[in-house]
Amino acid sequence: MRKKELFDFTNITPKLFTELRVADKTVLQSFNFDEKNHQIYTTQVASGLGKDNTQSYRITRLSLEGLQLDSMLLKHGGHGTNIGIENRNGTIYIWSLYDKPNETDKSELVCFPYKAGATLDENSKELQRFSNMPFDHRVTPALDMKNRQLAIRQYDTKNNNNKQWVTIFNLDDAIANKNNPLYTINIPDELHYLQGFFLDDGYLYWYTGDTNSKSYPNLITVFDSDNKIVLQKEITVGKDLSTRYENNFREPEGICMYTNPETGAKSLMVGITSGKEGNRISRIYAYHSYENFMNHVPMLRSPLLKTVGHQDTPPERFQPFIQTFILEYNAQNKKWMVPTSGYLPSYTSNLVRNITINADGNLQVTLNERYISLLHQSIEGDFRLKQKDIRMGSWYFAGGEKSNVLEIGFMKGSTKIRPDDAAISNASRMSIFMIVADKIEV
């Protein structure tokens, strides 16, 4: 098999790609992209099923902005540890495992068409099973659709020895139920705490680590087809600026390579779940290629250097980038919102988390991410607002713990007014423009 160019993510600073509005309240297990239709598919353990809870999972279909479109339920289908997405003549097929009845240490490889609102179980006729694939242990799949290859991870649950291996097949052979393995990658014992894996251009991306990296560090390890480790990096994304986790919980969940269907540019995506039980927050962070970074995050090309007098060590480097969005007023609902016609879908809608009016009568805009340093900020009202002599201003946060909360006050003439004052016309808009900076990881 011809090797393609390795995507080296180790010197790239990750950026938030999206926050996922998934169907269930449990921890994210995995995610995958339908690149042709610009959609994301996620898996979670299904809640509310009583004793079946730990053996069923839910698939959610979302937009690239992380907005939930629909979902389906797989009863007795395991945890949804990892899935593959196949676009077959316009129909999306899910590759997954299904537990074998009465054999808790074994599972079968299956694929089935995604159907919004459906519930499947082990007896559903929609499940295509692959009986000629000789899997004696539990299996987990991943797909490389560019090269039409299937990766099957197996692990030995009988002997408690943490043995895991991944076998690569031609996808069309697998669909035809033919057992023609191409090669196998043996996973070192110390990398057994799996949180996701993905196959791309002959390289296996292996994602490991436990909650808060307590016993096992959060690592991405990349293997080539010769069973050699070619890249490895510890992943620290998901901490806030004080190096804490939201509600002191952080768990790596899912990994996927996104390839722009038009340009071929790549982004390595990793999932992180944080927050308290019953209200988990699931986010995807991106290690973008330069081409994809330019498409998703408006940036300034020249990094900033932090220097303090004479330094014997290289100065810290900071990357300035732009955060900008438009807000529109709905007079009927008395709410400000990001207008659907006024944003870049891959960027702005992921920037704003929520918009409220706080106890001080100011508009409070909560962003998804904090920043290290605020370099510039301006708020500009449109003609409707200026015609009525309504102006806006904010309380600056130079950066840090509260930098994701933007508080905007309103004035009419010399009098302070509320953001939902009757003087504000329907469809009035304002533009918020900020230049901020984050530290460049090394």
Curated annotation (Swiss-Prot):
Keywords: Cell wall biogenesis/degradation, Teichoic acid biosynthesis. Pfam families: Phage_RBD_prop. One of its GO terms (biological process) is cell wall organization. It comes from the Bacteria. Unknown. Might be involved in poly(glycerol phosphate) teichoic acid biosynthesis. This is Putative major teichoic acid biosynthesis protein C. It comes from Bacillus subtilis (strain 168).
